[in-house]
């Protein structure tokens, strides 16, 4: 083994980097090109930021999908169907007719 210059950083040692540059190709040869290519391409591990996927936009002429959707029925409310105002009036009438002494 050849002696390595101690002043060189470990990533700049001879033989630490491949002679050819990394590519975006995913063939077997390129996947095993170097350790970085192996982890990114062969194993699929990347620690960078995840890109946001854009939502697919519907073509402009496809407006029929909106028309074919059935309308939902109005929500059914539980409790007194007359509403809170009328129920208060009923309570007031009952208290007027039956005063508590």
UniProtKB/Swiss-Prot annotation:
> Where does the record place the region Interaction with human CREBBP?
1-24
Q: Name one Pfam family in it.
A: Tat
Q: Mind telling me where the Glycyl lysine isopeptide (Lys-Gly) (interchain with G-Cter in ubiquitin) cross-link is?
A: 71
Q: Name one GO cellular component term.
A: host cell nucleolus
Task: Give residues annotated as binding Zn(2+) 1.
Answer: 22, 33-34, 37
Specify where the region named Transactivation lies, as residue ranges: 1-48
N6-acetyllysine modification, residue list = 28, 50-51
Region (Disordered) location: 1-20, 47-101
Extract the GO molecular function terms from the UniProt entry. Answer: actinin binding; cyclin binding; metal ion binding; protein domain specific binding; protein serine/threonine phosphatase inhibitor activity; RNA-binding transcription regulator activity; trans-activation response element binding
Matches recorded under Gene3D superfamilies: Tat domain
The record's listing under InterPro entries reads:
IV_Tat (IPR001831), Tat_dom_sf (IPR036963)
| Biased amino acid composition, Basic and acidic residues | 1-12, 83-101
> Where would I look for the motif Nuclear localization signal, RNA-binding (TAR), and protein transduction in this sequence?
49-57
Provide the residue span(s) of the region labelled Core. Answer: 38-48
Motif Cell attachment site per record, residues: 78-80
Q: Where does Zn(2+) 2 bind?
A: 25, 27, 30
Q: What else is known?
A: The MN isolate was taken from a pediatric AIDS patient in 1984. HIV-1 lineages are divided in three main groups, M (for Major), O (for Outlier), and N (for New, or Non-M, Non-O). The vast majority of strains found worldwide belong to the group M. Group O seems to be endemic to and largely confined to Cameroon and neighboring countries in West Central Africa, where these viruses represent a small minority of HIV-1 strains. The group N is represented by a limited number of isolates from Cameroonian persons. The group M is further subdivided in 9 clades or subtypes (A to D, F to H, J and K).
Give a short account of what the protein does: Transcriptional activator that increases RNA Pol II processivity, thereby increasing the level of full-length viral transcripts. Recognizes a hairpin structure at the 5'-LTR of the nascent viral mRNAs referred to as the transactivation responsive RNA element (TAR) and recruits the cyclin T1-CDK9 complex (P-TEFb complex) that will in turn hyperphosphorylate the RNA polymerase II to allow efficient elongation. The CDK9 component of P-TEFb and other Tat-activated kinases hyperphosphorylate the C-terminus of RNA Pol II that becomes stabilized and much more processive.
Q: What is known of its domains?
A: The cell attachment site mediates the interaction with ITGAV/ITGB3 and ITGA5/ITGB1 integrins, leading to vascular cell migration and invasion. This interaction also provides endothelial cells with the adhesion signal they require to grow in response to mitogens.
Q: Note the subunit structure.
A: Interacts with host CCNT1. Associates with the P-TEFb complex composed at least of Tat, P-TEFb (CDK9 and CCNT1), TAR RNA, RNA Pol II. Recruits the HATs CREBBP, TAF1/TFIID, EP300, PCAF and GCN5L2. Interacts with host KAT5/Tip60; this interaction targets the latter to degradation. Interacts with the host deacetylase SIRT1. Interacts with host capping enzyme RNGTT; this interaction stimulates RNGTT. Binds to host KDR, and to the host integrins ITGAV/ITGB3 and ITGA5/ITGB1. Interacts with host KPNB1/importin beta-1 without previous binding to KPNA1/importin alpha-1. Interacts with EIF2AK2.
The similarity annotation says:
Belongs to the lentiviruses Tat family.
User: What's the protein name?
Assistant: Protein Tat
Organism, scientific name: Human immunodeficiency virus type 1 group M subtype B (isolate MN) (HIV-1)
